[in-house]
A protein has these predicted regions:
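Conserved active-site alpha-helix within GNAT-family acetyltransferase domains
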Residues: 142-147, 155-184
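Conserved hydrophobic beta-strand within the GNAT/NAT acetyltransferase core sheet
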Residues: 115, 149-151
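Charge-dense, helix-prone N-terminal extensions
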Residues: 1, 12-16, 35-46, 53-54, ...
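Conserved beta-hairpin
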Residues: 14, 60-83
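Conserved acetyl-CoA-binding loop-helix of GNAT-fold acetyltransferases
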Residues: 115-120, 126-143
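Conserved N-terminal entry element of GNAT/NAT acetyltransferase domains
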Residues: 1-33
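A short helix-loop-beta-strand connector motif used in the catalytic cores of GNAT acetyltransferases and
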Residues: 25, 37-64, 88-94, 114
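Conserved acyl-donor/pantetheine-binding loop and adjacent beta-alpha core of acyl/acetyltransferases
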Residues: 53-57, 76-121, 125, 161-168, ...
């Protein structure tokens, strides 16, 4: 696959990948950026508009995987996967989320980036697209000054799960990508981290 940053030029490909439902239930990858009240009032077109505005600012918000490694115009190429990744402070929900709670409450989180979400087109699932996106995300964050990348994956313990259970990624995928298990968060979730050069 070819990986590209989400920006104004690749926005049309993201819209086609997410479809009219905004990936899942009108989320448009805004869940981690909003309070519950903001999210509920924005489901659908409002979330889409807000996410589109973010993409057009050039702020780091994530990467797309395309089904070709050619130099096809990004407005015509078909995206097959997405990973949301940004500085941890950009995700207001993480301040309150048990799964993302730092081990040390006094830790300086400057330079920590968070991988919050994956979305892979149903026709591309099972082909390693999410793992390729995760590898690219670590490099991309490092190039932008991250010192640590963290995630909040699901521990499937070898069991099959539905795609709606896996949007955080799997623990195995993160560990295979060089992340360390920092802490278990309940029976199915984990906090993982990888220090980047």
């Amino acid at each position: 696959v070819r990986i590209a940053e989400l920006d104004a030029s690749t926005w049309p490909a993201l819209e086609r990948l997410f479809g009219p439902r905004g990936a899942v239930a009108g989320c448009w990858c805004m869940w981690f950026r909003q309070t519950t009240g903001e999210y509920r009032s924005g489901v659908g077109d409002s979330n889409r508009s807000e996410f589109r505005a973010l993409a057009h600012t050039g702020a780091p918000i994530g990467l797309l995987a395309f089904d070709t490694d050619t130099d096809a115009d990004a407005t015509d190429a078909e995206a097959v996967g997405w990973v949301a990744l940004a500085p941890r402070g950009d995700y207001s929900r993480l301040e309150r989320a048990q799964v993302a709670r730092p081990i040390d409450p006094d830790e300086d989180l400057t330079g920590v980036w968070s991988v919050t979400c994956f979305f892979v087109h149903r026709k591309a699932r099972g082909g390693g697209v999410a793992a390729q996106l995760l590898d690219a995300a670590v490099r991309w964050a490092a190039d932008r000054g991250a010192r640590t990348v963290e995630g909040y994956p699901v521990d499937t313990d070898g069991e099959r799960r539905t795609s709606s259970d896996l949007y955080h990624g799997t623990l195995r995928m993160f560990v295979d990508a060089g992340f360390e298990l920092v802490d278990r968060r309940g029976t199915r979730r984990a906090l993982v981290r990888r220090t980047v050069p």
